[in-house]
């Protein structure tokens, strides 16, 4: 017998199903902001890049998709996968700091907008690399993303 999806699907599977539905119904959906929390759960880099491309397309920014009736959405995505994060037009990091407050401690959340240079450093860390070769890999990945965004490269 069929069971409720909430009982059998992981959070990542549910998010990817939502992405598939939103991608299919984007032209008819007027929801201004879509939030995906760890949609990369259980997937690798190659699939992560494809998911990143699909999320980016939901913004209506893909060639031939803006201005032709497609609903443009603001997409917020929480991810740990650099291949997916590379598709973002803006990149933020979120960190937590423990602050001493008298005898107690308080957790403080910090959201930081990354510059282009800081973004490369963050994506390199997300890749698990700390070398110049890792940095070059990130720069190459961002170059490929730029090609996808202009329509010069198609991911399969």
Where are these regions (language model features)?
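Flexible loop/turn segments at secondary-structure boundaries
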Residues: 1-2, 26-27, 42-43, 83-85, ...
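GG-anchored amphipathic helix commonly corresponding to the ABC/SMC/Rad50 NBD signature/C-loop
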Residues: 4, 12-34, 53-63
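Walker B catalytic acidic pair
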Residues: 37-38
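C-terminal lobe/lid and adjacent interdomain/linker elements of RecA-like ASCE P-loop ATPase modules
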Residues: 46, 50-156
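Conserved ABC ATPase signature
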Residues: 1-19, 41-46, 112-113
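Long, contiguous hydrophobic alpha-helical segments, chiefly transmembrane helices and signal peptides
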Residues: 5, 9, 14, 23, ...
């Amino acid at each position: 017998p069929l069971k409720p999806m909430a009982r059998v699907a992981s959070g990542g599977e549910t998010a990817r199903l939502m992405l598939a539905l939103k991608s299919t119904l984007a032209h008819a959906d007027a929801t201004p902001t879509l939030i995906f929390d760890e949609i990369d759960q259980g997937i690798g880099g190659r699939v992560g890049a494809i998911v990143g491309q699909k999320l980016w397309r939901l913004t209506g920014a893909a060639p031939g998709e803006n201005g032709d009736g497609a609903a443009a959405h603001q997409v917020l995505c929480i991810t740990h996968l650099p291949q997916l994060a590379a598709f973002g037009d803006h990149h933020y990091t979120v960190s937590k700091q423990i602050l001493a407050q008298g005898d107690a401690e308080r957790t403080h959340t910090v959201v930081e907008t990354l510059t282009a240079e800081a973004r490369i450093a963050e994506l390199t860390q997300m890749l698990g690399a700390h070398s110049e070769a890792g940095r070059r890999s990130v720069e190459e990945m961002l170059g490929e993303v730029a090609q996808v965004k202009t329509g010069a490269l198609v991911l399969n």
